Amino acid sequence: MSRFLRIRAGTAGAVVLLGFLLAERASAQQRIDAPRVDGHTTPLLVYSAENGPAGCAPLAVISHGAGGSENGYRYLAEAMARMGYTTIVMGHRESGLEALRADMRQYGLMAGVRALVADPTAEADRLLDVGAALRWDASQCKPPFRVLLGHSMGAETVMLEAGAKNIIGVTAPPAGQNRFDAYVALSPEGPGVVFPDDAWGGIHKPMLILTGTRDQSLKGGPEARQIPWHDLPGSKGQCQWMGVIDGATHMNFAGNGVGKERVEPIVTTTIKDFLNSWDNGACALPQPTRGISLQGK
């Protein structure tokens, strides 16, 4: 066989292999329209658990930020699936891209973002989406452990589910149902827009808060995103952690922006350490790692 033909054959084989791998990845995801209790539906993108033990896998549910969709946060969803979790990324239609664009047209850029994240109806609908995701997963099997993760407006959803007080009129229920075993809040908002001072003092379950030194907030700058952790009361075994990533911006946590390649592995490794530590019953902080400062209580 000539060198040219060997190259052509090798290239063809690589293309076939790539197509097979892409097909495998595609087959590991499932799109669902899950019914909500109000008669509407929420789109779910389900990532199958990998490398886990036999039986029903633990469940990770991911809530995107304002203007996002179930197609985002792929780096986080794939990492959770590799950890052995059935992973559901919810699509919050009432606070997705169309809703954000409408608010921006009416109020301007930042005022539009603020209007959407402080919309009580949009937040209540997000919590109905959470219920839809939980019911769909429960129809498949009963997971031994459930964790809710969210970024930005999704971190607000995490806090409202866990029982944080709010000043925008989201009632309990749908807020405060506390249906998960642990929570992960990426770039949570401090007091002033959705939450009052001392909003988080009643949350006792394991919680990981992650933010960055360049993670700007709607009110108060990057430091405001650390306030929720300081208000948490602490939990048995010191399972309430906060990590501050050096140089991380708000959009890095969504898998976007300059520096995301450095930030993403720090995020996913810290989440893995947190969940593994809780599972071991000790919640001991890992050894200090370059690029992030961690605290626990």
Describe each PLM feature range.
Residues 2-13:
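Bacterial N-terminal signal peptides that target proteins for export
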Residues 133-202:
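Primarily recognizes the serine-hydrolase "nucleophile elbow" in alpha/beta-hydrolase
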Residues 34-142:
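Serine-hydrolase catalytic machinery in alpha/beta-hydrolase-like enzymes
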Residues 26-28:
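Boundary at the C-terminal end of the N-terminal hydrophobic targeting segment
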Residues 62-66, 152, 188, 212-213:
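Glycine-rich His-Gly loop
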Residues 12-21:
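Bacterial N-terminal signal peptides
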Residues 171-244:
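The feature captures the conserved acid-bearing segment of alpha/beta-hydrolase catalytic domains
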Residues 247-249, 254-297:
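Alpha/beta-hydrolase-fold serine-hydrolase catalytic core, especially in secreted/extracellular enzymes
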